């Protein structure tokens, strides 16, 4: 897929993966689902679910390093700043030949890399973020999308990003 195709698909994901309602219990269920998927697959990832600025779920699975904690924070900051996936933000910056610093942000606090996805509620918008760190960025992104699609009973095959060319 090209950057433009990826950006188009991610926009579709962000629209389709919206909840009617989302509370602390739903946040915990989302985090637990990601933890179960990662454990079944032997993935060494960090998982974070944050509502507004409140951490609700965090798990670090075998293989995670202290660096992943910082990656989670920085990717989540991208979502909470722009209300779109960190991967979409990174792809757009790359397409435009820009960096986060060009937008007046610090790379120490913002990571435009895949793995954080907005938690959207219909009629409200972005209320938080679900973040995965530990895999290549496209895989982090796809895993977050997979968990959201499973929770919302959406067809993952029509939402998932295709393998890169």
From Swiss-Prot:
Top-level taxonomic group: Bacteria
Listed Gene3D superfamilies: Haem-degrading domain (3.30.450.150)
Pfam family, one: HbpS-like
InterPro entries with a match to the protein in the record: PduO/GlcC-like (IPR005624), PduO/GlcC-like_sf (IPR038084), YBR137W-like (IPR010371)
Protein family (similarity comment): Belongs to the UPF0303 family.
Name of this protein: UPF0303 protein Rleg2_2653
Organism: Rhizobium leguminosarum bv. trifolii (strain WSM2304)
């Amino acid at each position: 897929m090209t950057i433009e195709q990826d950006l188009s698909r991610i926009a579709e994901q962000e629209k389709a993966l919206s909840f009617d309602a989302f509370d602390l219990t739903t946040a915990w269920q989302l985090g637990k689902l990601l933890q179960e998927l990662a454990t079944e697959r032997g993935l060494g990832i960090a998982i974070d679910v944050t509502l507004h600025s409140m951490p609700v779920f965090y798990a670090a699975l075998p293989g995670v390093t202290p660096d992943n904690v910082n990656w989670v924070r920085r990717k989540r900051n991208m979502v909470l700043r722009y209300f779109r996936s960190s991967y979409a933000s990174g792809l757009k910056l790359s397409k435009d030949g820009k960096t986060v610093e060009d937008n007046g942000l610090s790379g120490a606090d913002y990571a435009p890399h895949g793995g954080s996805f907005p938690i959207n509620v219909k009629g409200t918008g972005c209320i938080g973020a679900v973040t995965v760190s530990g895999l290549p960025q496209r895989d982090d992104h796809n895993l977050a999308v997979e968990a959201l699609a499973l929770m919302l009973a959406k067809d993952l095959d029509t939402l998932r990003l295709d393998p890169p060319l």
